[in-house]
């Protein structure tokens, strides 16, 4: 596997879609949708999902990645992505909880305006992700193994990402459980500026899986 070509492909597949949606940004905002829209989010999420599976396959790890918007049997929460034991053959994108290795929250843009709802970063993060972390901790007790809850955003405001990363690392009890590709403010200006290089994504994934 040529890592550089995969990293370039990840960006090259997504950036043209961002530019296309950016040209229609006004229309999307008129419809009260976030910049990027669900369409763009789906394109990026599918690309990221394939990117993760390619890394897993290259290193012969015994895991598979669910399709987007998957469920864990007996759990009411819809997860953006689930990484599970490769031997499992899930039905209807529903995963056996005993086979789950990690769950992932994916955001096209991880930038949030704190003043919009007059909440602090900490309050927003707890209200947004607290229930999911409680669910993960409950599942861990039932299946008797660690399940990490990871966060990935394609673009983000740097300050917001730092707060998000600190929150996820604290609740996972380990470092490096959140990852951001691009600077959201620069992306709005049409500039492609990395927050963390694509090469660092492998380290993030291995850490999430406990395979460092």
Where are these regions (language model features)?
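Intrinsically disordered, low-complexity Ser/Thr/Pro/Gly-rich regulatory segments
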Residues: 1-212
């Amino acid at each position: 596997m040529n890592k550089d070509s995969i990293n370039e492909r990840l960006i090259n597949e997504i950036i043209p879609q961002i530019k296309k949606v950016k040209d229609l940004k006004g229309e999307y905002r008129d419809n009260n949708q976030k910049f990027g829209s669900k369409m763009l989010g789906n394109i990026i999420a599918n690309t990221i999902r394939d990117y993760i599976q390619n890394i897993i396959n290259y290193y012969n790890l015994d895991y598979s990645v669910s399709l987007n918007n998957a469920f864990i049997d007996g759990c009411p929460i819809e997860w953006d992505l689930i990484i599970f034991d490769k031997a499992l053959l899930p039905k209807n994108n529903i995963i056996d909880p005993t086979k789950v290795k990690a769950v992932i929250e994916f955001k096209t843009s991880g930038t949030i305006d704190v003043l919009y709802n007059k909440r602090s970063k900490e309050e927003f993060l707890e209200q947004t992700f607290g229930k999911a972390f409680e669910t993960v901790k409950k599942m861990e007790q039932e299946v008797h193994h660690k399940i990490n809850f990871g966060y990935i955003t394609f673009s983000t405001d740097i300050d917001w990402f730092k707060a998000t990363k600190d929150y996820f690392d604290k609740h996972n009890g380990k470092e490096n459980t959140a990852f951001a590709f691009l600077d959201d403010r620069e992306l709005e200006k049409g500039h492609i500026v990395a927050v963390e290089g694509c090469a660092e994504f492998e380290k993030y994934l291995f850490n999430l899986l406990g395979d460092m």
